[in-house]
Amino acid sequence: MAKQDVQNGEFLEKLIAVNRVSKVVKGGRIFSFTALTVVGDGNGRVGFGYGKAREVPAAIQKAMEKARRNMVDVDLNGHTLQHPIKGRHSGSKVYMQPASEGTGIIAGGAMRAVLEVAGVQNVLSKCYGSTNPINVVRATINALTEMNSPAKVAAKRGLSVEEILG
């Protein structure tokens, strides 16, 4: 699904989907294009953008700019997740769990693009329900932002990291 992988400055950019949409008016149809993109630094920062324009390149450019403005931080454990996580948005539900070194990214389509630009290299994941790319991207980013490192949990509870990990 990811059609473009460009190293622009310090960000990895991926184009997930381009769609032609139409508006029906008295004189006929007006066609425009939508683009869904994800941007990340490959080290725990990721964002997505959705752009719409009369031409494909303009839609992609708008989506990339929105993605750069809409970035969130993710607490990674090396190149995998801290713990198994679930996320949902609308009808899409995603489940991701950390994997051992050498596993790779076991994910489909839109979820794979988000994980790649976020810097996750080893993960097992599954998407349930709707596989609409926009909802899957939102669900994946929601899940990643809900993930907490042991240090964060320890700070919230007022305990040491060793006590949290057992």
From Swiss-Prot:
Residues annotated as domain S5 DRBM: 11-74
Keyword Nucleotide-binding: no
Entry's Gene Ontology molecular function annotations: rRNA binding; structural constituent of ribosome
Keywords for this protein: Ribonucleoprotein, Ribosomal protein, RNA-binding, rRNA-binding
An example Gene Ontology biological process: translation
InterPro entries linked: Ribosomal_Su5_D2-typ_SF (IPR020568), Ribosomal_uS5 (IPR000851), Ribosomal_uS5_bac-type (IPR005712), Ribosomal_uS5_C (IPR005324), Ribosomal_uS5_N (IPR013810), Ribosomal_uS5_N_CS (IPR018192), Ribsml_uS5_D2-typ_fold_subgr (IPR014721)
PROSITE patterns linked to this entry: RIBOSOMAL_S5 (PS00585), S5_DSRBD (PS50881)
Listed Pfam families: Ribosomal_S5, Ribosomal_S5_C
Any Gene Ontology CC annotation: small ribosomal subunit
Signal peptide: none
Subunit annotation: Part of the 30S ribosomal subunit. Contacts proteins S4 and S8.
Function text: With S4 and S12 plays an important role in translational accuracy. Located at the back of the 30S subunit body where it stabilizes the conformation of the head with respect to the body.
Protein family per UniProt: Belongs to the universal ribosomal protein uS5 family.
Domain notes: The N-terminal domain interacts with the head of the 30S subunit; the C-terminal domain interacts with the body and contacts protein S4. The interaction surface between S4 and S5 is involved in control of translational fidelity.
Entry protein name: Small ribosomal subunit protein uS5
Organism: Alteromonas mediterranea (strain DSM 17117 / CIP 110805 / LMG 28347 / Deep ecotype)
